């Protein structure tokens, strides 16, 4: 799971970018030992803000970040919606 500082930074950035929801998925959400990245899915990010948000997450969190936009429907985003752990919204 996320450490306290990373979680707070995600919450701060979610508010800054007026996100509707943030889900944690992947190994960090499953609480696997030794996870090496943070997989996040966001809903409500404006298309022109996606890469700014991604850059801030990459520079401010303690681990590398993978970010997906839930507004792009696919089997994968549906699975993330079903199995992701809500951390904002």
Residue ranges and their predicted role:
Residues 1-23, 29-35, 43-89:
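Catalytic core of pol beta-like nucleotidyltransferases
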């Amino acid at each position: 799971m996320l450490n306290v500082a990373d979680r707070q930074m995600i919450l701060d950035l979610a508010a800054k970018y007026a996100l509707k929801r943030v889900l944690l998925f992947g190994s960090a959400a499953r609480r696997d030992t030794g996870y090496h990245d943070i997989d996040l899915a966001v809903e409500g990010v404006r298309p022109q803000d996606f890469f700014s948000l991604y850059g801030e997450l990459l520079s401010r969190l303690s681990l590398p970040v993978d970010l997906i936009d839930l507004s792009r429907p696919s089997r994968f985003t549906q699975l993330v919606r079903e199995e992701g752990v809500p951390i904002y919204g």
